Amino acid sequence: SDLWVLCTLPQDDEMFMPPEGNDPLSATDLFMLRRWIEEGADWPESAKLSPKKKNFTELGVLPKDLYRELGFSEGKVKDEFSGYRQEIITSKLNFEMLPIKGGQFTMGSPLDDPNRGKNEFPAHPVKVSDFWMGKHEVTWDEYELWMLNLDKDNREYNKIEESDGDGLADAVTKPTSPYVDMSFGMGKSGHPAICMTQLSAKMYCMWLSARTGKFYRLPTEAEWEYACKAGTDTAYSFGNDSKELSNYSWHVRNSRFQYQKIGQKSPNPFGLYDMHGNVWEWVLDQYAPPAKEKPKQ
């Protein structure tokens, strides 16, 4: 039911229901609503719902406003399409971005792949444009600059005069401070950041854009798979022999049931590390069943 979906969205979602000016439904109300829907009751035509207005002051700067202030616009890459190392100002941290030349590839897995997931077929052609991808997974060192507001604390401690970019970066919404250590004792320095929502991952990219003046976003599912396959058509970017997997990834049989520091295994042909293991990554778009028509862009 669309009504159920709208009433159970995050409260800061612009489509969130109930009607404007009313409090969210209680757990009891939601239970009754679900029972009502399951019993096949029709929604009265006279009843109208309108989404609750967002409080932009509380929610922080919007993506479109942030990117407009930064002067970003859609279009082809104007600068040289090459790898670079990005420094995060006010910290001693930096990360590498690698250029991924676009092209067409087969997204998904063939039916004869014994390790394929049930949602990985039918395999279908997809085209992707040029893009950049981080050489490594985002580390806690990088992520906590935003999540714990360490970037702002560093500027204040070192009495660094605030710039326009600082103000925009500070306006990006931050998550609620965690109640427990989200590394669960597995280590933080040099380790990949985990346990964030997709929204938090998007907000981090917004903050990183404001902090650096370069446009950052999550990769699409197609871009991620294209980068993972790295121009190959085998089960793994290194071939079909799963016995070689431990040379390229951390997985359940060699990781001692915990994540490991980034970049310790061999990279794939595109120079990207930990694409076959260690931790999962968020992508920009949502899952949709594969289409069978002509290659998608």
Language model features: what each stretch is:
Residues 81-95:
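Short aromatic-glycine motifs in intrinsically disordered, low-complexity regions
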Residues 1-83:
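Aromatic- and Gly/Pro-enriched helix-to-coil junctions and flexible linker segments
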Residues 7, 17-19, 107-128, 259-265:
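Short, polar loop/linker segments at the starts of domains and inter-domain junctions
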Residues 249-276, 294-297:
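Short, well-ordered junction/capping motifs at the entry into regular secondary structure
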Residues 37-41, 107-115, 127-239, 247, ...:
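Active-site microenvironments of metalloenzymes and redox enzymes
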Residues 92-107:
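Mature N-terminal segment immediately following signal peptide/propeptide cleavage
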